Amino acid sequence: MKHAEMTGQIIGIIPARYGSTRFPGKPLASILGKTLLQRTYENSLRASALSDLIVATDDERIFEHVRSFNGKVVMTSEQCPTGTDRLAEVLSLYPEWMHATAIVNIQGDEPCLNPLTINLAVQALVNDPQGQVSTIVTPLLDEEEAKNSSIVKCVMDQQGNALYFSRALIPSNKTNSFKNGAIYFRHLGLYVYRPSFIINYQKLPSTPLQLEEDLEQLKVLEHGYRIKVAIVDQANIGVDTPEDIHKVEEWLCKQNTFL
């Protein structure tokens, strides 16, 4: 882990909860001899943009596990309603990080996340001195995925700022049909924030579109902040259910890059 050609500290934080409706104990699930969380942590360390990396958890089992592989970890409250709230608590425990250039929120169930994707998301915010948030999207070419309400879509302006996020098919047309050749983008759950924005975000009231779509990022847009968007070639294989473990193992074996 080293500094890329960027100014100031870039801190990566991996929020990790033991409880999960679809997959209890997910962070400690085994993937080819290492846990999901360890693979995510070690893979994230390969991102040259990061100056530091820490796991934020409310569970003693996860805390001890991260320490067992010499990772950096901090205990946070069980009362944090969202991952963003957990980031804010970490900043209260490490006040010196309030002076960092950016904080990267890395999902704990992304063991296949390309470290270059982290770098790209960070660079998008660093290149926008007035920006507060950046994120990642990837082209969406499959009609079934494009119409899947579990997959969040994004449309952007010509400057690479998010215009809207939706569970519906966007952009749409008069017949609400998938159009081959149209540009659809899938939103990936990686965010980069200015430290001060994380604190301010907690104070912002919920907004109508955020509540209707059940998408936190819409609160950012509805309150007038912009989200800078970077584009990557393809999505990563995340782990939502126990069945996804096999997909990740197959991918790792094919890549043979960080077994």
Swiss-Prot record:
One of its GO terms (molecular function) is 3-deoxy-manno-octulosonate cytidylyltransferase activity. Its EC number is 2.7.7.38. It is an enzyme of class 2 (transferase). The keyword Cytoplasm applies. GO terms for cellular component: cytosol. It comes from the Bacteria. It is found in: Cytoplasm. Keywords: Cytoplasm, Lipopolysaccharide biosynthesis, Nucleotidyltransferase, Transferase. It catalyses: 3-deoxy-alpha-D-manno-oct-2-ulosonate + CTP = CMP-3-deoxy-beta-D-manno-octulosonate + diphosphate. Pfam families: CTP_transf_3 (PF02348). Its main location: cytoplasm. CDD domains: CMP-KDO-Synthetase. GO terms for biological process: CMP-keto-3-deoxy-D-manno-octulosonic acid biosynthetic process; lipopolysaccharide biosynthetic process. Pathway: Nucleotide-sugar biosynthesis; CMP-3-deoxy-D-manno-octulosonate biosynthesis; CMP-3-deoxy-D-manno-octulosonate from 3-deoxy-D-manno-octulosonate and CTP: step 1/1; Bacterial outer membrane biogenesis; lipopolysaccharide biosynthesis. InterPro entries: Cytidylyl_trans, KdsB, Nucleotide-diphossugar_trans. PANTHER family: 3-DEOXY-MANNO-OCTULOSONATE CYTIDYLYLTRANSFERASE, 3-DEOXY-MANNO-OCTULOSONATE CYTIDYLYLTRANSFERASE, MITOCHONDRIAL. Belongs to the KdsB family. Activates KDO (a required 8-carbon sugar) for incorporation into bacterial lipopolysaccharide in Gram-negative bacteria. NCBIfam families: kdsB, PRK05450.1-3, PRK05450.1-5, PRK13368.1. This is 3-deoxy-manno-octulosonate cytidylyltransferase. It comes from Protochlamydia amoebophila (strain UWE25). The lineage of its organism: Bacteria, Pseudomonadati, Chlamydiota, Chlamydiia, Parachlamydiales.
